[in-house]
């Protein structure tokens, strides 16, 4: 039997979803869950450093060898990410769902303190959508882990990255046939991109204290670039990797305007999910939408067979 996954939001966003016929995959660093994109930083660099000291292998970077060369590469990567995180340059576009459509913690945290709604979508249809873009977009059930388990994940990913570093220079020489100075540039560039990919893996995890949320996330498999020339420009010569994803984002990024911020997002067309994507809307415990008004809204924007019901939770602000 198909499962319904619920997206909690305020009433204004519900109207935007229905009238614009699109969901918004928004910059996660501007959300309640902004810490998750930093989950593996700087821990993974520290773990790689510790692992290399314990089991060193021949390594060269920028004229320096072994431990000194590796330390130099780690420091450059650390400095890059410290600055980029501060500037909002390392992020992902995410939309969150919950397995339960009438849950107090979700009303409080994600639906305007119960004044909003939850919108039900088919898990199967969301999976089919992500399959159409399987090299770019994923939908995953969040895995809830203890701090110790998250640390073990970081250590395992650090070991994996170190193994990739062993052969990175040879791979660059074989594929780019470039000068020595370009080799160093590519070494740092690809190491940073390798770390970015690993940082995006953190979106699959949350601390076990949030386990009751039963959350699912749809997100991009690779980090979002906020480079203007990639998203809005004509020059693609600088592209090295993630080209297919950059092409999908090109000229599509838009902005949600808050009183004190702008939040970039990727619009996900509901028609690309299903002919009848919205299965149900649940009115929150402090929401005042009446059935007839909701039916008029559905009629105006040509939504058929959308179930509507009220929260059964007794909750007042």
Q: Where would I find each of the regions flagged by the language model?
A:
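Partner-binding and oligomerization surfaces adjacent to conserved cores of proteins
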Residues: 1-317
């Amino acid at each position: 039997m198909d499962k319904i996954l619920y997206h909690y939001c305020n009433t204004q966003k519900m109207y935007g979803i229905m009238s614009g016929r699109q969901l918004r995959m928004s910059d996660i660093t501007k959300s309640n869950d902004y810490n998750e994109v930093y989950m593996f930083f700087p821990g993974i660099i520290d773990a790689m450093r510790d692992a290399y000291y314990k089991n060193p292998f021949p390594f060269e970077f920028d004229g320096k060898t072994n431990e000194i060369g590796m330390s130099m590469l780690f420091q450059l990567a650390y400095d890059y990410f410290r600055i980029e995180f501060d500037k909002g340059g390392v992020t992902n576009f995410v939309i969150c769902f919950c397995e339960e459509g009438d849950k107090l913690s979700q009303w409080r945290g994600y639906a305007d303190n119960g004044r909003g709604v939850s919108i039900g979508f088919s898990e199967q249809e969301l999976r089919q959508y992500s399959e159409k873009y399987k090299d770019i977009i994923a939908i995953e059930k969040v895995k809830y882990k203890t701090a110790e388990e998250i640390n073990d994940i970081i250590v395992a990913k650090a070991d994996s990255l170190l193994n990739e570093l062993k052969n990175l220079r040879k791979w660059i020489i074989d594929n780019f046939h470039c000068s020595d100075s370009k080799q160093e540039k590519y070494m740092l560039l690809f190491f940073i991109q390798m770390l970015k990919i690993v940082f995006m893996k953190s979106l699959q995890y949350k601390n076990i204290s949030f386990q009751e949320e039963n959350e699912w996330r749809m997100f991009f498999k690779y980090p979002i670039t906020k480079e203007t020339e990639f998203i809005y420009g004509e020059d693609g010569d600088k592209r090295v990797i993630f080209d297919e994803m950059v092409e999908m984002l090109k000229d599509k990024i838009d902005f949600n305007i808050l009183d004190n911020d702008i939040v970039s997002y990727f619009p996900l067309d509901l028609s690309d999910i299903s002919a009848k994507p919205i299965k149900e809307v649940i009115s929150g415990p402090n929401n005042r939408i009446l059935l007839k008004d909701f039916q008029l809204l559905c009629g105006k924007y040509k939504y058929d067979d959308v179930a509507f019901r009220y929260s059964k939770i007794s909750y007042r602000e």
